[in-house]
Structure formats: C-alpha cells, structure tokens
C-alpha cells in the first residue's frame, strides 16, 4: 500500500469515528479540513513560531495556522468572518485547538501571526514538503504551466517618468572604422538559462502594478495586483507556484517555475500555451529531459499546427485552467484582502495547500 492510502485509511476508519464520538457529527467541509491538515502535517513546520519562554506568552500559532487553512477550505472572504464562524461552530473551533470561545484570539493577533507566517514563507514550505512526499515518488505524465491574475486592493507601483534618451540613428550596413556600437542588453530568458533557481526567482519583479491580458473574446482587460504562475500535474494537483508583478509576461517565469518543479517531481511532458513559445523555454525543457509541447505563437506568418499526437496530449493542459478556477472559486483566490507580495503569496498558498491535499486524496476514489 502507498503512504497516501495509509493516511487516508487511518483518517476514514480511525480518526473520523473517534472525532465523531467526541464532537457533533462532522460536516463534509469539516472532514475536508481534517484531511488537509493531516496530509499537510502543518505541526512539523511550527518550530520557528513557538514561544521560546521570553516575554509574554503568546497565543498558540499552530491553532491560528490551522484556522487560516480552514479559512481557505471554507472560502471565507475575510478573517473577521472566520473568527465569527469559529465562535458559532464548536466542531471547527475544537478541531483548530480552542476548547472555548474565550480562547479564540483577536483579529489583530490573527493579523500578527499571518505576518510572521508570510515573512518565513511558511505556506510555500508546507506545500513543498507535501508535494515532495506524496507526489515526488511517482512519475508525472504532464506538467501544465499557466499564470492567472490576482486582483488586490493595493495601490500600484508607478515608475518615475524619465526623459527619453534620443540616440542618433546610425546608418545601415557595416560600422565605420573606429565606430563603437553599444551591445544589446541580454534578455531575461537568456540569463535564466545560466542561473540557479534562487537567483532566477530573486530577479522576478514582485511589486504590485497593473497587468493586461486578452480575454477569451479577444478584448483587453486590465487588473491591479499580481500574477500567480502555477505548474500542475494530471489529477489537477498544483506542484509549484511563483508570484510576480501583474505586468510580468508569462514566459518570464517559465524557466524558474520549471526549475522548481524539477526539484520536486519527475515528469515527461511540459504543456504550455502560445505565451511560452520561446526557443529558450523549449531548449530548457529539453535539457531537463522533458518533451515540450507548446502552442505556437504566430508572430510572423501563419500559425503552425501541432502534429496529431501532440495535439491529443495538449488537451491535458486543461488541468491548468481547472486549478486556476478552483483556487479562485472555492479556495479564497478571489478574496485577497492583504497587501504586499509576501502576504498575498501566503494567502494563496493556503488555498493551494488545500487543493493539493484534496486532489491527492481524490486519486484514491
């Protein structure tokens, strides 16, 4: 039996019956929350957040962390709604670790704890550990890469206007003797090929700004905020995620995202839409031992059609669209009420943790 099945069997046949003997009958959402917490093993990541015996003893950070996961599972728009529900639901309150209503911390305490989790990248660490443990040992057929807009209530960063530098237009043809031609700056994609994951991620802009995309009807739409780049595998399981400024083109995060995914799982095919049609991305995918299947971008001339076999495989890319919509519709992706890239990423990661656990267990159905 697989470790994943052992965990599922223990939850279904041991943990649920015991909890229902101690609590009221569990709802479907409460059962989902329990499965997410058990698979994510969030308690293993709490050492940096425990009280060290200095100063006033603070509220239990593990209970607050589990409450934030519940916020994603229940798709609550605000922390205030979460706290109100914890006061009303004896089951969920006790599942998080608070026996009485008086033990539930204030909204400001929740906010301070969330800031601590964000500074430490706790959501990313929990998700990475869960993916490596439960998806890493298995061979993944397809990695579907995509980006989705993240709309926030934050003032966008605006660059200081600079006076345009007018360069004298040089004549076509060979340069004259002694003429010095300024070298072109290397493109980010070219630089990424020779750098590691940490350096590539650090190079991506993460300030809140304005992004623009063309929707399914061909109209341009804009939003203020960020862009979430996600790699997902068959079964609608998110494997890796990066947050960038909204204005960053999808292709600029492809290589660092591929590096992150390659550290976590072994896969065969990389599926991407025409936004990722760049020779650097194709070559890096092949360098990883993958087969890149990328919809061509008709920049010049007519659009090249895929061969029939690749076209069939490319249909699996709908995985990315389902993960994006699942995050936004069911796990808090539309209710980003925090500011700053670190906090926004933590909020979204709690949703991705819930999706990952839920979809992994669905593989057993």
Residue ranges and their predicted role:
Residues 1-45, 362-365:
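Charged, often Cys/His-bearing segments associated with DNA-binding zinc-finger transcription factors
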Residues 342-365:
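Charge-patterned, long linear interaction tracts outside catalytic cores
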Residues 53-62, 220-221, 338-348:
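Structural motif
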Residues 27-74:
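Basic, short loop/linker segments at the boundary and entry of helix-turn-helix/winged-helix-like folds
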Residues 57-125:
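Short, positively charged, Gly/Tyr-enriched micro-motifs
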